[in-house]
Amino acid sequence: MTQPFIAVIPARLASTRLPNKPLADLGGKPMVVRVAERAREAGAQQVLVASDAQSVLDAARDHGFEAVLTRADHPSGTDRLAEVAATLGWSDDTVVVNVQGDEPLIDPVLVRDVASHLAAHPACAIATAAHPIHDAADVFNPNVVKVALDAQSVALYFSRAPIPWSRDAYQPHWPDVAAMPAPAFPVYRHIGLYAYRARFLRTYPTLAQAPIEQAEQLEQLRALWHGERIAVLITESAPEAGIDTPADLARVQALFQPSSK
């Protein structure tokens, strides 16, 4: 049986690398609408766009999606979702999935599976996903977030650094990253997709920001710092990359162009 869930898409215009990103045109529709369509395909009972920009809310509503105005001072997408959860008064056990607003190619099946993964792990406050890394360049890329897991695939830590560090494999080559071998042991890349229970979302803003969260700029570390558990669904295939730069946008825009005949 498919786990019922609500999908919320946090979207802000103030992107430093790609201004007005949520409204970027993808085949005649704004990016945030393309993401909302993916969430709807995943089977969400309700799809909401959460933003501090009226233009984003208008774009969502113009295409038939619900939209909620939020404050502009949220430090993370999870904080923005927490405001929505408090405003709409969802029951404690409602499963809420945070679908990143710059992921118009996100697999709807993965969205649905992460929601179900949370339901299957009642001791965990959050569920997310990861996939194996096979390229040494990704291991050492700080823009690729890694996650270390315990025996039950519950997160031990998330980092932009290469974790776990293979002393015998990496130390002889350090600091020549180009000479590093491909990992011969499991290294997992975190996929920025989260499922929460509404009860936890309402608690999240009351938790003080953690030093490790601020250092790594990874919002999920606040939950770990305060003793919460994060269940990680392992998927063998890497998801399509999100949109962070003008080059990323051009690549994805090409995919939404009608095929020429």
From Swiss-Prot:
InterPro entries: Cytidylyl_trans, KdsB, Nucleotide-diphossugar_trans. Pathway: Nucleotide-sugar biosynthesis; CMP-3-deoxy-D-manno-octulosonate biosynthesis; CMP-3-deoxy-D-manno-octulosonate from 3-deoxy-D-manno-octulosonate and CTP: step 1/1; Bacterial outer membrane biogenesis; lipopolysaccharide biosynthesis. GO terms for cellular component: cytosol. It holds the Pfam family CTP_transf_3. It is found in: Cytoplasm. Its EC number is 2.7.7.38. GO terms for biological process: CMP-keto-3-deoxy-D-manno-octulosonic acid biosynthetic process; lipopolysaccharide biosynthetic process. Gene3D superfamilies: Spore Coat Polysaccharide Biosynthesis Protein SpsA, Chain A (3.90.550.10). It comes from the Bacteria. It is an enzyme of class 2 (transferase). Activates KDO (a required 8-carbon sugar) for incorporation into bacterial lipopolysaccharide in Gram-negative bacteria. This is 3-deoxy-manno-octulosonate cytidylyltransferase 1. It comes from Burkholderia lata (strain ATCC 17760 / DSM 23089 / LMG 22485 / NCIMB 9086 / R18194 / 383).
